[in-house]
Amino acid sequence: MSIYDEIAQIVGPENIHTDYIERLCNSRDMSVHQGIPDAVVYAKTTEQVSAIMKLAHRDKVPVTARGSGTSTTGAVLPVRGGILLDLHNMNKILEINKKNFYARVEPGVICMQLNNTLGKDGLMFPPNPGSEIIATIGGMVSTNASGHRAVKYGTTKDYIKGLKVVLVDGSIIETGSITPKTSLGYDLTRLFCAAEGTLGIITEIICKLEPKPEYGALALAVFGNVNAAGDAVTEVTTSGIKLAGCEIMDKNSIKVVEKALGKDVTKIEALLIMEADGAKEVVVRDMNRIGDICKKYNVLEYEWTDDPARREEMMRARGGLVPTLSRIKPGNRLVAIAEDLGVPSTKIPETIRRAQDIAKKYNILIATFGHVGDGNVHTTFVCDVRSRDDWNRLKPAAEDLVKTAMEMKGTLSAEHGTGLTRAPHIALQLGPAFEVMRKIKQAMDPDNILNPGKMGLEKGKKADLYDYFTFQPLVEHPEGVNSYGLDIDNEVLACIHCGFCRLGCPTFSVTQRESKNARGRNALAYYLMNGSIEPSRELADAFYTCTTCQACTYFCPARIKVDEIVEAVRKKLYKSGYVPEPILGVRDNIIKMNNVFASAKAERIEIYPPALKEKAKKGELKAKAETLLFMGCVPSYLDMKMVPSLLKPLDAAKVDARARNFTRKTL
């Protein structure tokens, strides 16, 4: 019996997948890397995780934990194969203690869902990454994630009181305490924060909570000079004003979202979005003080509001920036390889200028934005991922950005973690302390089973920025080995694998499998396009189970045309002879009966209002009408009472209408 047969006995055969298609669907994240597991395992309890780890430890099989898969650094990719341990089904809020301000949650709980639940009791879990709508608490702990509120509230580690962790040998430990403070022994809770699953598997988290602020306001300040914007922020943050958020966008970023801003941006060099919350009288006073400070630095425009709708409108440009970067030019997309610098807040303007100089030096686009209040600068590349020349220029540009951060006494990763992307440079920042990290890893995981290949922890292997490079086949064959046509190819490449589509996909909702979600299907479309896979029955199952309802596109920040990608893949599958039998049956129904359900037209007419039914039977329905009703397949053949129910009030209102196909035989 193989280890995977044993695991199937632990989690059930429906919760382990070893087929190649499902494994490929779990091989990507938002980074430039890929890693294909040997098995995808869905665990639901700490005991299951413990049993799995005992087997993996016995057989020395690698285990990589994964939540929603939103990493920008490749941290959740199983680059050495083995087990991808998916924890997103461990999603229970186990306890909310309102009096002692803590919550116990499983690692698969989504950040926004937790806050929606807490909000009913006037509480909140402050860290809010840009992916909070899909990010799991376990993933946030593993990377010490934060967000724009970090300037006031700090990062995830500041809100973790304790953890339950499964170690490499399957033993279970609990760290921390629910008490307000403790000074007993080593702070093991912090040790597992930002460890990215290299030391243990987190299966339960005790989150520290805060009261929700009673009032909040947002200010927008527009500057014609980035230095002036930086100086204004410095004075604001050193004048006693406690900002809850402070975002900056440089001229390249502003140009990208010009349409969302709704204004001419030619004279704008920097845009600040500042947030304050707390007691109303204090916030109002601070908003006015911020305006006075900005005027000292020649602000072009300044406004603040406490209206929720206006606040949302003001944040729309910042919120839409990242996905818009993949829509600047067809075939180009954002690339996360040196996108998470952290510098002292006073160094933000100089860092932005240097990033702009680096962009000019290498003739590439770098959009610079970030959480200026806590010194976090996102320097995001945009390039043609098919261009070898672009990749050759990006690499030295990334090296220059790393040097910039080091010269500023900063950090290479402020909130996105280390993973594969930051591994080549981690020793540069940490120095001798990095060897201490390696010794800790060796002591806790001597066989290098837990998330191997990450964080540069392995001695004797020099990490490279393009390790496990997912775009290599495309660089070698930029025309696409199995192109769908340029427009569809560009749609495939525009997807950044953020996973937001999970929120809308009905087939994922039912199956909880990545092959039944838009992100997974797009990964498969990419692998088919670059020649890594061929048409197959399993591939057909992934694409013909898609309803093409476009709910994924609604949730997709970049509005990827997933339905068109699916249709393009289906054409290739059809030409190769791979179409599921039920689909062929639907085709035959349409040919024989003019509808997908093989329903006779006469059966529909029988339930219609008597006068209308008589006219239909005699063929006396008008050929034309002022209003045309197109009801679709379900009302026409399954829930058929919907049509006459609608026709009755229309008749009463004397609306001249007819439902399509009373006189045609196509439906």
Tell me the role of every PLM-derived stretch.
Residues 1-29, 58-61, 293-313, 407-429:
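N-terminal accessory segments
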